[in-house]
Amino acid sequence: ISKRKKIIKNYFYNDNFYRNLLKKKKNNRLKSEYSKIKKYKKMIKFVYQDSPKGTGDAVLRCKNLINSKYFLMLMPDDLIINNNCSHSLIKLHNKFNSSIIASRKVNKKNVSRWGIFKIKKINKRNFLINDVVEKPSIKSAPSNYAVIGRYILPKKIFRILRKQKPGLNNEIHITDAIRTLILQKDKFIGHIFAGKYLDCGSMKGYINSSLKISKI
């Protein structure tokens, strides 16, 4: 995160705020949520990015926190409800012993907003990823299967990111590093997840997503 975005860290560590709020409100739901925050904040580590240099740069800064051969990565502006997508990816990883990336079909008119896969179908919900392109034009897009922000990636991707040159918008993209591994014949499986997808990557998307969740 950016050092300027203190609100994210305060969400987990501002204990006085929560204690005072619970004294005033005496709300069981708030009490339950605060209990969850206390439980999980012990597991959370914060890594700072000095300037927005892309997702690849942000991931590279977490290198020293990863000890296993593979790791699970989530993009917080891609929200998936009514299904545990991460659990599904882990099951597939154990089955195929490979990297797994969540995907969904998008309107062909909107492919330039996404990373897009070139695929070879395995079954109804899974496909082999032969290539991935970051935000292609409609004409150059290899499909309309988009990258969604749930990944199981190999630790060796850090080696690629360390040497990677900036791409689109002069940023280091995780998609470009994944593409390098695919071209080196690393196996990547795409998974069309169950559940409802909510895009929180824009102010409009965030507000719409909040309204939808409030009705659940």
Model-derived segments and spans:
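Short beta-strand/loop segment that forms part of the nucleotide-sugar
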Residues: 1-3
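Catalytic-core segments of class I nucleotidyltransferases/pyrophosphorylases
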Residues: 72, 86, 90, 122-198, ...
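Residue-level signal for alpha-helical context at structural boundaries
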Residues: 26, 80-81, 175, 196
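Conserved beta-loop-beta/alpha segment of the NTase-like Rossmann-fold superfamily
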Residues: 8, 18-23, 30-119, 162-164
